[in-house]
Amino acid sequence: MGEQNHSPGKELQHRTRAEAPGKKSWHSQAYALGAVSNFMSTFLTFPIYKVVFRQQIHAMAVSEAVRQLWHEGPQYFYRGIYPPLLSKTLQGTLLFGTYDSLLCFLSPVGPHTLGHRWAAGLMSGVVEAVALSPFERVQNVLQDGRKQARFPSTFSILKEFNSYGLWGRLSLGYYRGFWPVLARNSLGSALYFSFKDPIQDGLAEQGLPHWVPALVSGSVNGTITCLVLYPLIVLVANMQSHIGWQNMPSLWASAQDVWNTRGRKLLLIYRGGSLVILRSSVTWGLTTAIHDFLQRKSHSRKELKTD
């Protein structure tokens, strides 16, 4: 397969992932690319995300969510963007780096089976959930329009969380809604990495331009994964929008509340799904394509140095 020009994606994957034991299983440029690409895609798709968030909280139509945001004023349209910008930048670093490290730990010399990719993706999702859940918590409070007066800034939210006791800071503050976050991130990462490479390899064999297989693979995987886990996304948004000591509903009570407010219909839980498809397609398509491009350039430079 190495000599076939129409299969560059697979050739690259063999060079990057089937490294010899004892060698580094990650590349600093790949980490940097994950950070930069996630930063850019988050900024570009944040308005879409905010509309989706309002739908998840208030179960309203797209037009009503847009009208509500516009009524609050353009100056608030990007309110709450700093936590996701920081968290997504860290996510890009953790997502690809941790996955590759775990994959090479599970199978140092390859080939990497579906089970290896699933396990490495699952564990990288756990790391991601532990590291980034506090950022998402602050972000969801900031984006809830009902709390703008009480919590106008990130600092005001952090001040509220730090006023709790140690256990309260974790369970009611920074890690509120952690269990559904853990399930969503671990399963989502496992699904994404399990099928990203097979789809990309299949498209690369069709003689398409280098960037197309990665873009399509990331878009398809991001869309399918997001739709499969969308009920968990809605549950997390609702749980993490609550703040304070009193009347803090449990995980089960929050799930029941989401189900009841959606009229006990699965279709209403998926309200906003069209925007989720668009946001996930753009975000994961760009992230995967840019990461693949940087990875390819990195290895091209290394080959020139060795020649």
Swiss-Prot record:
Q: Where in the cell is it found?
A: Mitochondrion inner membrane
Its membrane topology is listed as:
Multi-pass membrane protein
| InterPro entries xrefs | Mito_NAD+_Carrier (IPR052465), Mitochondrial_sb/sol_carrier (IPR018108), Mt_carrier_dom_sf (IPR023395)
Q: What is its main location?
A: mitochondrion
Q: Where is this region: Disordered?
A: 1-23
Q: Per the record, GO CC terms?
A: mitochondrial inner membrane; mitochondrion
Start-end of Basic and acidic residues biased regions: 8-22
The superkingdom listed in its UniProt entry is Eukaryota
One Pfam short name: Mito_carr
Keyword Cytoplasm listed? The answer is no
Checking PANTHER family in the record gives: SD08549P, SOLUTE CARRIER FAMILY 25 MEMBER 53
Name of the protein this chain belongs to: Solute carrier family 25 member 53
Q: Which organism is it from?
A: Homo sapiens
Which gene specifies this protein's sequence? SLC25A53
